[in-house]
Each structure stands twice: as C-alpha cells, then as structure tokens.
Amino acid sequence: MVFVKSTKSNAYFKRYQVKFRRRRDGKTDYRARIRLINQDKNKYNTPKYRFVVRFTNKDIVAQIVSASIAGDIVKASAYAHELPQYGLTVGLTNYAAAYCTGLLLARRVLKMLEMDDEYEGNVEATGEDFSVEPTDSRRPFRALLDVGLIRTTTGNRVFGALKGALDGGLDIPHSDKRFAGFHKENKQLDAEIHRNYIYGGHVSNYMKLLGEDEPEKLQTHFSAYIKKGVEAESIEELYKKVHAAIRADPNPKKTVKPAPKQHKRYNLKKLTYEERKNKLIERVKALNGAGGDDDDEDDEE
C-alpha cells in the first residue's frame, strides 16, 4: 500500500472547531462530565453528587461536588495535607494516604449530615470489597466517582481513595476490578494484597529491600521517614492509629494564623492641616527663642 500524506484542505480549517479551554488544558473531560451531572427529569431540584479525586505533586484533593447552572458547589472536602493532624506526617501522596483522604472525606460528610452513627462503614480495613447497606430510617449518601482525565489502571491511587470512601460509609457504585491486588487471570481480588497496600505494606517492603541491598539509597530515598523516626516495621501500626483518629474526629481543624508583623515605616506620614499648622507655630517659636538668646549675648558683651 502506498503511503499517502494527509493534506488539510481549506474546508478542514473552515469547519475546524476548537475544543473547550479546560479540555485543551487537560483539566476537564466533558464527555464524562455530561454523563456524570445529567439528572433524571423527574427529580426536581435534586443535586447529583460526585466524589471527585485529584492528585498534585504534593497533595491529594477529595471533594463531594454537585453541579448547578451557576457552577459547581463543593459540599465537603478533604486534603492529604490535613493528615499530619491525625498522625501521618510522611508519604502523603501514596495509595495508603489516598485511602486515608477518602476515609476522612466520607466521615466528614456523614458527620455534617448527622449520619455518622447510622453508617459507620467498614471499621477494620480487611482489603475485601465493601458496600454499605441501607438502613430503615435514611438511605446512605450516594455519590458517583469522578476521576477526571487520569488513566484508570488497576491499582491506581484514585481507587485507594475510593476504597477509603466506601469503608467510610458512602454509597458509590463501583467494581473491584481496579483495586490493587485484582488478578486479571482468575478475575478475583486478592484481599491480602489490597490490605497490604491500604496499610502501607508496599512502602515498608521497599524500605526493607533498600536497607538490605542499598543502604545509601535508603538514606536519600526515605530521608523524611528517617528524620521523623518512622521505621518499616511500624508503618502498619501508624496507619491503624491514623484511621482511628480520623473516625474519632473528622471535623476540619481551624489553623491559627500568626498576627501580621508591624513593619517599620520609612516614608513620612502625611500630616493634616491642623498638624502642619501646629508644627509651623512650634518652628516659629523655636526660631524666636533662638533669636532672643542671641540678643541677650550681645547685650552682655
């Protein structure tokens, strides 16, 4: 087959339609968004909530968001940079931290709706799939997973946040195919492997491996862990304490900001008319006083 170079004609450029700016920036998948926010026409003024998870280089953002004509409304949010308040000071962007962030958001939104006692979720994370069961009084809080434009591969951190929200008591439609530990061959989830990821076992295993093979790399790669005194054997207990602390008090903590410093003023303050007038009178008095002293000296001579 002969290779034919595709030429873009005038008709192509005439009919070319530029995509939305946020799609060009790689921020919003409008094809997925329109399917996530479309509400049934017989549900009047009923918001459709999304469980939004986004990752930055140093943080994890989890939000419960509903769409409106005026714009998206954030009902509740949780961030990985809040986890140091619960005892997790290192590794704020891995799979285990994503689980903690999802758990924090779930407990926070249920506490806000006064449903935290009714829907406790899965208190002990075993790695097995969990779905909340509705009670007789109130239905569980339902949200749809919004992953944005990331690649939904098996074991992605976004599914760690999903697992945390599920164990926290939220009702999110899902499948266990993308959790860490799912085997493609036998199409089953290995709960032990998934539990290992939830409690940071993959991190502790790598720390042990580096400690045996490359101690120098361990000092540089896990310098923050070593500085904080976090050892490979204590990581699982650390995450268990963090989960318990999140369930005990998921409310957001108010940060106390220091008072602004009083900077030294280098430019002269603008004087009012009365201040200028008084200053002039003082200068005249000072000059008159100096002139009177000179006259006295002349008389003495």
Swiss-Prot record:
<dbReference type="GO" id="GO:0008097">
    <property type="term" value="F:5S rRNA binding"/>
</dbReference>
<dbReference type="InterPro" id="IPR005485">
    <property type="entry name" value="Rbsml_uL18_euk"/>
</dbReference>
<dbReference type="GO" id="GO:0005829">
    <property type="term" value="C:cytosol"/>
</dbReference>
<dbReference type="GO" id="GO:0051301">
    <property type="term" value="P:cell division"/>
</dbReference>
<dbReference type="GO" id="GO:0005634">
    <property type="term" value="C:nucleus"/>
</dbReference>
<dbReference type="GO" id="GO:0009507">
    <property type="term" value="C:chloroplast"/>
</dbReference>
<dbReference type="GO" id="GO:0005730">
    <property type="term" value="C:nucleolus"/>
</dbReference>
<keyword id="KW-0217">Developmental protein</keyword>
<dbReference type="Pfam" id="PF17144">
    <property type="entry name" value="Ribosomal_L5e"/>
</dbReference>
<protein>
    <recommendedName>
        <fullName>Large ribosomal subunit protein uL18z</fullName>
    </recommendedName>
</protein>
<dbReference type="InterPro" id="IPR025607">
    <property type="entry name" value="Ribosomal_uL18_C_euk"/>
</dbReference>
<comment type="similarity">
    <text>Belongs to the universal ribosomal protein uL18 family.</text>
</comment>
<dbReference type="GO" id="GO:0010015">
    <property type="term" value="P:root morphogenesis"/>
</dbReference>
<comment type="function">
    <text>Component of the ribosome, a large ribonucleoprotein complex responsible for the synthesis of proteins in the cell. The small ribosomal subunit (SSU) binds messenger RNAs (mRNAs) and translates the encoded message by selecting cognate aminoacyl-transfer RNA (tRNA) molecules. The large subunit (LSU) contains the ribosomal catalytic site termed the peptidyl transferase center (PTC), which catalyzes the formation of peptide bonds, thereby polymerizing the amino acids delivered by tRNAs into a polypeptide chain.</text>
</comment>
<dbReference type="GO" id="GO:0009955">
    <property type="term" value="P:adaxial/abaxial pattern specification"/>
</dbReference>
<keyword id="KW-0699">rRNA-binding</keyword>
<dbReference type="GO" id="GO:0005773">
    <property type="term" value="C:vacuole"/>
</dbReference>
<keyword id="KW-0694">RNA-binding</keyword>
<dbReference type="GO" id="GO:0006412">
    <property type="term" value="P:translation"/>
</dbReference>
<dbReference type="GO" id="GO:0022625">
    <property type="term" value="C:cytosolic large ribosomal subunit"/>
</dbReference>
<dbReference type="GO" id="GO:0005737">
    <property type="term" value="C:cytoplasm"/>
</dbReference>
<dbReference type="GO" id="GO:0006913">
    <property type="term" value="P:nucleocytoplasmic transport"/>
</dbReference>
<dbReference type="GO" id="GO:0003735">
    <property type="term" value="F:structural constituent of ribosome"/>
</dbReference>
<dbReference type="GO" id="GO:0003729">
    <property type="term" value="F:mRNA binding"/>
</dbReference>
<keyword id="KW-0539">Nucleus</keyword>
<keyword id="KW-0689">Ribosomal protein</keyword>
<comment type="subunit">
    <text>Component of the large ribosomal subunit (LSU).</text>
</comment>
<dbReference type="GO" id="GO:0022626">
    <property type="term" value="C:cytosolic ribosome"/>
</dbReference>
<dbReference type="GO" id="GO:0009965">
    <property type="term" value="P:leaf morphogenesis"/>
</dbReference>
<dbReference type="Pfam" id="PF14204">
    <property type="entry name" value="Ribosomal_L18_c"/>
</dbReference>
<dbReference type="GO" id="GO:0005654">
    <property type="term" value="C:nucleoplasm"/>
</dbReference>
<keyword id="KW-0963">Cytoplasm</keyword>
<keyword id="KW-0687">Ribonucleoprotein</keyword>
